[in-house]
């Protein structure tokens, strides 16, 4: 029987692969494009997803960790090679996230942590699914929408 952590890791890998698929469709020279001046660029969004992976792992180890926010001005891509390197970092970050999730046993997934984003104690399972995977899916939807006017 497949464990819950294995199922979550498989889902996390599928989410990441889909995100990377979208990023690879970004036309060269459009990596820093943003829909509005105050919005994160495509590259900043990719970087933000990497930060969210790192935050997830740290939050589970450091229960007092404050929520993170995506920011503009974190990344500026000068050429397509740099963007491919950012995508590679995103792939590696996703692999680390999957390995981390796979190592969580059932009791750990069901343990609770206070998460300010939700205003209450939630399970680690909830932090992974709602706080990280759903968050990435949200940004992947943005990326999909951004691709339409760029292509």
Features from the language model and the residues they span:
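Basic/polar N-terminal segments that are highly enriched at the extreme N-terminus
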Residues: 1-6
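Short, contiguous alpha-helical
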Residues: 9-13, 17-23, 30-74, 115-151
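Helix-adjacent hinge/juxtasegments
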Residues: 59, 64-101
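A generic structural signal for well-ordered alpha-helical segments enriched in polar/charged residues
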Residues: 17, 21, 92-99, 103, ...
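Acidic catalytic patch
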Residues: 29, 102-119
């Amino acid at each position: 029987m497949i464990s819950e952590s294995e199922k979550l890791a498989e889902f996390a890998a599928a989410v990441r692969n889909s995100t990377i698929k979208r990023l690879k469709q970004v036309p060269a020279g459009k990596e820093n494009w943003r829909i509005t001046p105050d919005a994160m660029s495509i590259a900043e969004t990719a970087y933000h997803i990497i930060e969210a992976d790192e935050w997830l792992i740290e939050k589970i180890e450091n229960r007092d960790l404050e929520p993170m926010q995506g920011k503009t001005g974190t990344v500026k891509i000068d050429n397509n090679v740099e963007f491919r390197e950012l995508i590679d970092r995103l792939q590696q970050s996703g692999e680390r996230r999957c390995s981390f999730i796979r190592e969580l046993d059932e009791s750990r997934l069901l343990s609770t942590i206070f998460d300010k984003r939700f205003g209450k104690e939630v399970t680690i399972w909830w932090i992974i699914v709602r706080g990280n995977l759903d968050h990435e899916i949200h940004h992947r939807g943005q990326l999909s929408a951004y691709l339409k006017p760029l292509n």
